[in-house]
Design a protein with these regions (language model features):
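Core nucleotidyl-transferase/polymerase catalytic module
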Residues: 1-137
């Protein structure tokens, strides 16, 4: 699971990509609302059960209307990056055609035409070094 450590830039990229698919009239009319909403997702105050208030600047908060769809799109984007990263020097475009995945939020079930023997340590290290993310090994 990665949603708590997801970089702001990636989350914002997906939110912007989704916004660009909106009807142009609505996009222009409600841009200020969208910008306010996204900014409050990117930097949010969270009340903890202990009564403490924390500021969170990473991740995608659960419970908002588009958490699952955002995580679906982020998950697919990350898988494409991961696939290209782990298969440098190979015909990634041809291999990607044989890749398949089922995504639900930050969970996934994938088939791949090639998987390195050291996949787990390499992918955990990639997420840490490239994105500053923690993923469960």
């Amino acid at each position: 699971r990665y949603d708590g450590t997801m970089p702001r830039a990636l989350f914002k990229h997906i939110k912007d990509l989704r916004w660009e698919k909106m009807n142009k009239n609505h996009r222009e009319r409600y841009r200020h609302v969208h910008d306010w909403y996204v900014e409050n997702l990117l930097t949010r105050y969270v009340l903890m059960p202990s009564g403490e208030v924390t500021i969170q600047r990473r991740g995608n908060p659960s419970g908002q209307i588009s958490t699952t769809m955002d995580n679906n799109m982020i998950n697919f984007w990350l898988q494409a990056f991961e696939f290209a990263y782990l298969n440098k020097g190979k015909d990634v475009e041809a291999l990607w055609k044989e890749y398949d995945t089922i995504v639900y939020g930050d969970d996934r079930l994938s088939t791949t035409p090639c998987l390195p023997d050291d996949y787990v340590p390499r992918v955990v290290q990639m997420y840490k070094e490239v994105f500053g993310m923690w993923v469960k090994p």
